[in-house]
């Protein structure tokens, strides 16, 4: 079962800030999180039932460090459309 510890952060990029005007929040999670798991976490911890959830899987970038190849962690990104007038005020919890 999904837990709130699987949510890494709420993304604040130029694109996500433009989407917030339309009631969409972008959330970065661990790769094992599912749409139903995220919906349950949002309902339990934030008291919000999302209208829709879209997800995409992001592969970690390959980077060089001191001449050696390394890879950043993989993650999932969720675009969560919230009902009209609802926000995640206690998102820092």
UniProtKB/Swiss-Prot annotation:
Source organism (scientific name): Campylobacter jejuni subsp. doylei (strain ATCC BAA-1458 / RM4099 / 269.97)
Stretches that traverse the bilayer: none
GO cellular component terms given for this protein: ribonucleoprotein complex; ribosome
Family: Belongs to the universal ribosomal protein uL23 family.
Self-association state and partner proteins as the record states: Part of the 50S ribosomal subunit. Contacts protein L29, and trigger factor when it is bound to the ribosome.
Stated role: One of the early assembly proteins it binds 23S rRNA. One of the proteins that surrounds the polypeptide exit tunnel on the outside of the ribosome. Forms the main docking site for trigger factor binding to the ribosome.
NCBIfam families: PRK05738.2-2
Pfam family, one: Ribosomal_L23
Gene: rplW
Record-given protein name: Large ribosomal subunit protein uL23
Keywords: Ribonucleoprotein, Ribosomal protein, RNA-binding, rRNA-binding
